[in-house]
């Protein structure tokens, strides 16, 4: 009888834990949602995580440390990329700065320092394009004319248009937001914090992976 009771309690405990885990799982319409319109990804064979951000956003700045640590641990079937949000023209200077730094090959070096210039040193106005050009020129050590040409290039204007369309299609209501596999979106606001948003992203990634495997 004692043995039966022990087995029963273990089974009951496992069932209870399973139900609790299920209850705690992120829910569509709460911690995440389906994007307004599916977004094309660069590599359909893998799972894409797209961060939508703005250098002028303090929450995006605060997201940097936990996000970077999380990205380093992503499995091989997941890749990460960034895209500046562009819901209105005032965000364009920082979006141009991001794409210009990519074009000039200094994005990896200057991404975090640009955040810090805006939020830590408070020496850069994120809505001032001329100030952004001056900052990138000084920090990169590149010729100013080359930086100006990058900011005003046709390629970057094309990237800005694409970013604006992607932002609209994602249904994002703010930043930082994470779009997983071009189909699902979560954010710190939806999930209740930066760490929670990353946990929600993990949950979505796991389910997308299972869905891809089932379709093979």
Features from the language model and the residues they span:
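Periplasmic c-type cytochrome electron-transfer domains
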Residues: 24-35, 127-130, 196, 200-201
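Extracytoplasmic thiol/disulfide redox context detector
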Residues: 2-89, 164, 168-169, 206-216
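Solvent-exposed, acidic/flexible segments
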Residues: 46, 56-64, 87-94, 103-107, ...
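A short alpha-helix capping/helix-coil boundary motif
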Residues: 48, 75-78, 110-114, 141-144, ...
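C-terminal cap of thioredoxin/glutaredoxin-like
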Residues: 4-5, 138-216
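A short structural micro-motif
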Residues: 14, 117-120, 153-157
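Short, contiguous strand/loop micro-motifs
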Residues: 54, 84-85, 120, 150-151, ...
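Structural alpha/beta surface segment adjacent to cysteine/selenocysteine redox centers
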Residues: 62-134, 203-211
